[in-house]
Swiss-Prot record:
This is Large ribosomal subunit protein uL22. InterPro entries: Ribosomal_uL22, Ribosomal_uL22_euk/arc, Ribosomal_uL22_sf. This protein binds specifically to 23S rRNA. It makes multiple contacts with different domains of the 23S rRNA in the assembled 50S subunit and ribosome. The globular domain of the protein is located near the polypeptide exit tunnel on the outside of the subunit, while an extended beta-hairpin is found that lines the wall of the exit tunnel in the center of the 70S ribosome. Part of the 50S ribosomal subunit. Pfam families: Ribosomal_L22. Belongs to the universal ribosomal protein uL22 family. The lineage of its organism: Archaea, Methanobacteriati, Methanobacteriota, Methanomada group, Methanobacteria. HAMAP family: Ribosomal_uL22_A. One of its GO terms (cellular component) is cytosolic large ribosomal subunit. GO terms for molecular function: rRNA binding; structural constituent of ribosome. One of its GO terms (biological process) is cytoplasmic translation.
Length: 154
């Protein structure tokens, strides 16, 4: 069965490259905020941005899931932000995979931008933690799916 993308726009397949990752053990909320931050960026700028987030030099603005999130110094346009390192590493891997797919198709990798990026909640991996007096508390692990479509700029 073919992978379905949330991106339905008719495109020239010779000028687009795609990549997808499923069931990653990262926070869906962090991933949504990272995707919103890098959507529409050039690939080189997005990679530099994600590397800065991993090194905790730049923060990701949390615009939707920002309750109890502190302000960050040096953030432009939005005060609340965090450094979601684990999610940024996974998004960077998928972005590099999409760039490699573009290179394989013979596209100019210096001229790529992120046409579409989205993240969705995946399956929840059930788990339990033993508690006192023989009880158990659910401790579930959320997973995330990521989709990226790169396009060559004209």
């Amino acid at each position: 069965m073919a992978n379905k993308y949330a991106y339905n726009k008719e495109t020239n397949e010779a000028k687009t490259a795609r990549a997808m990752a499923k069931s990653l053990k990262i926070s869906p909320k962090h991933c949504v905020e990272i995707c919103n931050a890098i959507r529409g960026m050039e690939v080189t700028k997005a990679k530099n941005y994600l590397e800065d987030v991993i090194d905790m030099k730049k923060s990701v603005p949390f615009k939707r899931h920002n309750r109890q999130v502190g302000h960050r110094k040096g953030q432009e346009g939005w005060a609340a932000g965090r450094y979601p390192v684990k999610a940024a590493e996974q998004v960077l891997k998928v972005l590099e995979n999409a760039e490699a797919n573009a290179e394989y198709k013979g596209m100019d990798t210096e001229n790529l931008f992120i046409e579409h990026i989205s993240s969705h909640r995946g399956v929840v991996l059930p788990g339990v933690i033993p508690r006192a007096f023989g009880r158990m508390t659910p401790f579930n692990t959320p997973t995330t799916h990521i989709q990226i479509v790169l396009q060559e700029a004209n």
